Amino acid sequence: MLDMRQMLICSAILLTLSMGIRHGFGLWLQPMTQAMSWGREDFSLAMAVQNLTWGFAGIFSGMVADRFGAFRVIVVGILLYALGLFGMAHATTPLALLLSAGVLIGLAQAGTTYVVVYGIIGRNTPVEKRSYAMGLAAAAGSFGQFLMMPVEGFLISSLGWQQALMALATIALFLLPLTWGLREPAFAQGQSPRRDQTIVQALREALSYPSFQWLMAGFFVCGFQVVFIGVHLPSYLKDKGLGPEVAGYALALIGLFNVFGTYGVGLMGSRFSGRQLLTCNYLGRSVVISVFLWVPVSNWSVYIFSCCMGFLWLSTVPPTNGTVAKIFGLSHFSMLGGSVFFGHQLGSFMGVWLGGWLYDHTGSYDVVWYISIGLGLVAALFNWQVNESPIERGHPQVSAA
């Protein structure tokens, strides 16, 4: 097993930068579309494809990580990240933007974020410390969102949007040395864990299991909400007459309070069930968004909304992945984690694309906000039905009420 401190430090730095860089892509929406005379739908489609590619590729990166270890997957992911950022900086058509920011960076994220990292943590952490370790890793990714927002805003204002992307590509390459700290000894020696199921059997079992379906549907809602807000909130606030610095502070606050939320939910994982934590999270999101739309828009209403939403932002990730591990075990954990995350990314695709499409056709984001509220209520209902008991193969599941 890996040394736990080494594993958590390397995982934290990797997630800080890989998650942090992508969190700021909304800052590029207006400068890129204005400079290239594109519609918001063009940029939104590229971000939507990025999230969809991330989710779909995550299933396969999980398979490879389960079979051969995460080291090679992460190295390839980092190289693709740098290449995608370079291509995004030099995109001159919507198609080029879609291929670079959409496909390449989507593939990169599948190899450098939670799907792969949580597999390492699950295999190298005692079960009683797993929730804490996953919460700590999620908090690191959240800190990256807080850290990188002002960094990316500064790079854009000082270098211009194109050179800022080139700078981020260089930063991404500095992640390569960290991969040695995540090289699992057994995989490095050509060994892999013994499994009672094939990949196809494990995937078929999970996809036909009601609780996995509920988790996947709930994660769809999570993706819809957070990516819509992350990409379109800056433009929404500008349309409301607020300065660009308000959007920068808002996204930074989301990242900061996400640190507290993800770390806190990791600690609470030993006291409350995953379905309880997830149900409360999705209900809370609907309440927070409803209040935000109800009160007059001001700097302070935006900051309070960002703090509350940030606390709920990615605190779905540790209990969702922890519940998957409880039900199905660790043999195919990275693949199954990638599969449930695919639901998240389907939601991300819909949230970011629908936001741009409805804005271009109605001149407003209001409908998407209302959809987000309704989906939060549906996700709370879905997750309340999850049964976290380890699967008894060959026996039907009884849903928890």
Located regions from the model:
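Extracytoplasmic gate region of multi-pass secondary transporters
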Residues: F25-L29, P210-Y263
